Amino acid sequence: MAYERQYYPGATSVAANRRKHMSGKLEKLREISDEDLTAVLGHRAPGSDYPSTHPPLAEMGEPACSTRENVAATPGAAAGDRVRYIQFADSMYNAPATPYFRSYFAAINFRGVDPGTLSGRQIVEARERDMEQCAKVQMETEITDHALAGVRGATVHGHSVRLQEDGVMFDMLDRRRLENGTIIMDKDQVAIPLDRKVDLGKPMSSEEAAKRTTIYRVDNVAFRDDAEVVEWVHRIFDQRTKFGFQPK
């Protein structure tokens, strides 16, 4: 019988959403063009070539290596792309994703990525075209509600601030906002103004966000209501504590 990955315990909607994020089997909610993605990221001009940091691997004449022969380079590494990033902040008020689960999603579903997890933001670094592939999936699917999440390369504050009156997460640099029922972004991730308004789609209703979130909250799905999750968290902490002290 083929092994089926379990990813995460639990019987609640939050646990199911966490499994979906980790598996990469995500529902696509919106379309973002490659040019709009490039504009939002701000690393190069839309339509321009990828700058490189070294020649393509095929031209470098590297020495024989069994690992290199068995593990194909990612497209970005093969082309010699420089390393670039995308960084998200996710609201504590039922945003679909959390920093840890963005990192799990990236590490499980993409090669050559370096996810970084902090309390209020999450960054993925990779060769530029590889990073863009990971970024596009996150920006187009249910892992992101652009009213409750922001692409923020600098001044990331807002994840723990209560939502604005229009239901949008606060952004001190005003990179994106609600206009005519959709979220638009007219600055890149470090707040440099764009020559266009990038349409990031309609925000989720508060009811839909509560169904799609990966966050346990006492006013939605409480952590202690998911008995299997509590059991496994206790088991992991118990074993880490005991064996961290190396009991004799």
UniProtKB/Swiss-Prot annotation:
Coenzyme M binds at residue 121. InterPro entries: Me_CoM_Rdtase_Fd-like_fold, Me_CoM_Rdtase_gsu, Me_CoM_Rdtase_gsu_sf. Its cofactor is coenzyme F430. It catalyses: coenzyme B + methyl-coenzyme M = methane + coenzyme M-coenzyme B heterodisulfide. One of its GO terms (cellular component) is cytoplasm. Its main location: cytoplasm. It is found in: Cytoplasm. It holds the Pfam family MCR_gamma. MCR is a hexamer of two alpha, two beta, and two gamma chains, forming a dimer of heterotrimers. Belongs to the methyl-coenzyme M reductase gamma subunit family. Component of the methyl-coenzyme M reductase (MCR) I that catalyzes the reductive cleavage of methyl-coenzyme M (CoM-S-CH3 or 2-(methylthio)ethanesulfonate) using coenzyme B (CoB or 7-mercaptoheptanoylthreonine phosphate) as reductant which results in the production of methane and the mixed heterodisulfide of CoB and CoM (CoM-S-S-CoB). This is the final step in methanogenesis. This is Methyl-coenzyme M reductase subunit gamma. It comes from Methanosarcina barkeri (strain Fusaro / DSM 804).
